[in-house]
Amino acid sequence: MRLIFIAKMLQYSFLPFSPFNLLNFDNSISVSWFITYSVIVSIWGFAVWIEGAYRNKINLQLPRCTKIKCSRYNTRIKSPKWFNCKNWMHFFLLYLFLTASNLIVQLAYFSKEMCSQGINVPGTKKPGNRVYLSVIILMGNG
């Protein structure tokens, strides 16, 4: 079942999502819809990933009465605030990476579709030599 969730998440992340073709309001690209979609897919992917990590943690957890202490355990004992901050920082950076990569993929497919229909998308060059990253940069600064 988990494999099906991961396959669907990858399908929705790295393949064009057809409802975005209908989201042109007044011939302008609505970036908020792309961001919302990317956030939802990233949350979904993170939930599947966390569930697997939690299951592995429980299976690999040492019994409580053991005398063995690893470096991670020692770090958590010495500075618990830094340990929590570091974990949340990893979580946040990975989440931002997932959201940004999803956003780039969806915008690239969307701008390619718009160019094939003859609609001019800012940041694209000749039809054979399109630069999709510049579309995202222009939209972010716009």
From Swiss-Prot:
Subcellular location field: Membrane
UniProt keywords, alphabetically: Membrane, Transmembrane, Transmembrane helix
Chief location bin: membrane
Matching InterPro entries: DUF4668
Pfam families xrefs: DUF4668 (PF15701)
Transmembrane segments: 3-23, 30-50, 91-111
Topology in the lipid bilayer: Multi-pass membrane protein
Any one annotated GO CC term: membrane
Keyword Flavoprotein carried by entry: no
Name of this protein: Uncharacterized protein YIL029C
Organism: Saccharomyces cerevisiae (strain ATCC 204508 / S288c)
Organism phylogeny: Eukaryota, Fungi, Dikarya, Ascomycota, Saccharomycotina
